[in-house]
């Protein structure tokens, strides 16, 4: 019989308070009004979303705000089948990169509003290039999940 | 360019579920194995480099204190390096820089992880900030599944072909691991076992995914003068590269993946390699997921873009192929994360010094070791050769 080796249980619980900063604060206020806000880089002219304080490529401040389209195309996707620690959404769910119309980077979010019971039925409806639009929750908290998901059109 | 640097030996623990000993004792097991392999003593070591995953994996934040006695670092300078999955490669490169700079002649480099003590996927989720990326990425499988899907969609590779190639990689590596005494998961699987396994995150199934492993690895880096004096067959560091992506996950293309290609370019330039598929004899790719290994064949210039599945199915990267990849079984069979990329370096060095045992690639003279980490954010490479 294999020898039993004992272990000792120890849990770590640590609270944190993250500073939001003025740019994300405005972005979250936009979500409460059902607006998706990005900003335009004055150097490369790209529109990046979510809004951020500076362009990562050009390393210059971005002060010009743009309300971007709530429709776009799926760039890539996966279906989460296993629950993960601290996740706000129960599996199965579809995580995806979405290129909103007129923007120059991909937004990470969920695709939903379709039958998620089988990967094969999902693969018929969700592909690279599938058009999707934002579906909003009735109650807003100023959080990315104020957009419940992006639904295939 | 700094001084010439060699790897004079290494040690690994038996990887797997190791609740038979404490974490520091696991670290010591690798250190002692490296001392036996090289014939040196701790008195010969000028400095120690140590690293793990982020502290949430360990449950102890200050690991170089926790491991101080096990590492033999008391009374010596110690450096800690941590870059998530790339940690082991960053450790190796830290050791290399230290010796190349001339500030040390012999450096002990140690990576470790005891993944069964914590919750690896919970730790992986804390690698992401909680408000934008974390809710959508489900630890590592979500990230790599999306990257794999993006790759197949970019080149219109039929799903059946990708599935077949990924299954072959899984079957081959789980069998390769049977010849590696340190490997964690050693299995004889069929193609159907892999293709019909439980879904983790579509399209990734159970045998496409690496395990949680407990394990440690120690590698000794030395100056040319020391290496020639005490080691019959050193593995000479011929090239290295490291490159990272931005934080924002949707900002860059992860298929024609700039940071992987750039890391390889840096390493090939330094090593004088122009045709990696022909010139390299063996590669230890950081392959926590089958699809990730396929993608890297293209990023590293082994296969033309969109052709990795065809080349894999033709056997190019199998043990008896043109460029054997992960003959140790790779990350897919053994993943104590803080040690994992350092194991790639140790395995590459074993191959070019003819010490890889039952998974030795005959006559291997030039080998590539790879580390991948962050949220698909970092790539690092070290190339080692039998000739100084």
For every predicted segment, state its role.
Chain B
Residues 257-261, 265-291, 299-302, 332-337:
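Extended C-terminal subregions enriched in glycine
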Residues 338-388:
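C-terminal amphipathic "assembly/sorting" segment characterized by alternating charged
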Residues 82-113, 141-179, 219-225, 333-356:
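Active-site-proximal alpha-helical scaffold in enzymes
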Residues 55-63, 249-253, 286-310, 338, ...:
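Short glycine/threonine-rich loop-to-helix capping motif typified by GTGT followed
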Residues 2-3, 18, 54-110, 114-144, ...:
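Conserved catalytic cysteine-centered active-site region
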Residues 7, 42-52, 77-83, 107-111, ...:
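Beta-strand segments within the central parallel beta-sheet cores of soluble alpha/beta enzyme folds
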Residues 1-86, 94, 151-165, 184-190, ...:
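Conserved active-site "lid/cap" helical segment
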Residues 1-24, 33, 130, 154, ...:
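Condensing-enzyme catalytic core mediating Claisen C-C bond formation in acyl metabolism
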């Amino acid at each position: 019989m294999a020898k039993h080796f004992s272990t000792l249980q120890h849990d770590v619980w640590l609270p944190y308070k993250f500073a939001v900063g003025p740019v994300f604060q405005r972005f979250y206020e936009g979500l409460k009004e059902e607006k998706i806000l990005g900003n335009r880089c004055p150097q490369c002219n790209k529109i990046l979303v979510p809004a951020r304080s500076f362009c990562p490529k050009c390393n210059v401040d971005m002060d010009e705000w743009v309300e971007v389209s709530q429709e776009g195309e799926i760039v890539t996707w996966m279906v989460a089948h296993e629950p993960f620690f601290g996740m706000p959404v129960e599996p199965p769910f579809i995580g995806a990169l979405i290129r909103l119309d007129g923007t120059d980077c991909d937004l990470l979010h969920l695709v939903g509003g379709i039958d998620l019971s089988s990967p094969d039925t999902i693969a018929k409806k969700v592909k690279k290039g599938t058009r999707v639009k934002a579906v909003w929750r009735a109650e807003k908290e100023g959080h990315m999940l104020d957009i419940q998901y992006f639904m295939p059109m | 360019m700094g001084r010439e640097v060699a790897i004079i030996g290494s040690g690994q623990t038996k990887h797997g579920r190791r609740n038979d000993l404490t974490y520091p004792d696991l670290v010591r097991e690798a250190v002692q194995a490296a001392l036996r392999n090289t014939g040196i003593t701790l008195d010969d070591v000028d400095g120690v480099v140590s690293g793990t995953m982020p502290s949430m994996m360990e449950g102890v934040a200050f690991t170089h204190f926790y491991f101080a006695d096990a590492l033999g670092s008391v009374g010596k300078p110690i450096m800690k390096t941590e870059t998530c999955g790339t940690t082991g490669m960053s450790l190796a490169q830290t050791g290399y820089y230290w010796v190349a700079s001339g500030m040390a002649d012999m450096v002990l480099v140690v990576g470790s992880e005891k993944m069964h003590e914590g919750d690896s996927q919970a730790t992986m989720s804390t690698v992401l900030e909680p408000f934008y990326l974390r809710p959508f990425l489900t630890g590592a499988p979500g990230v790599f599944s999306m990257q794999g899907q993006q790759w197949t969609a970019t080149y219109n590779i039929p799903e059946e072909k990708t599935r077949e190639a990924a299954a072959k990689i899984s079957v081959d590596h789980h069998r390769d691991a049977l010849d590696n005494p340190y490997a964690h998961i050693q299995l004889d699987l069929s193609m159907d076992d892999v293709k019909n396994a439980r879904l983790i995150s579509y399209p990734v199934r159970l045998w496409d995914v690496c395990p949680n492993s407990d394990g440690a690895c120690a590698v000794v880096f030395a100056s040319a003068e020391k290496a020639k004096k005490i080691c019959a067959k050193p593995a000479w560091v011929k090239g290295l590269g490291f490159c990272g992506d931005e934080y924002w996950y949707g900002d860059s293309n992860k298929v024609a993946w700039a940071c992987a290609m750039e890391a390889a370019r840096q390493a090939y330039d330094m090593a004088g390699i122009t045709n990696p598929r022909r010139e390299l004899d063996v590669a230890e790719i950081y392959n926590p997921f089958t699809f990730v290994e396929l993608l890297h064949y293209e990023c590293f210039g082994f296969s033309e873009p969109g052709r990795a599945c065809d080349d894999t199915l033709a056997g190019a990267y199998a043990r008896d192929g043109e460029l054997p990849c992960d003959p140790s079984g790779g990350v897919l069979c053994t993943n104590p994360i803080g040690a994992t990329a350092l194991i790639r370096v140790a395995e590459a060095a074993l191959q070019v010094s003819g010490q890889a045992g039952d998974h030795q690639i005959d006559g291997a003279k030039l080998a590539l070791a790879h580390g991948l980490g962050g949220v698909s954010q970092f790539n690092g490479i070290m190339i080692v050769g039998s000739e100084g």
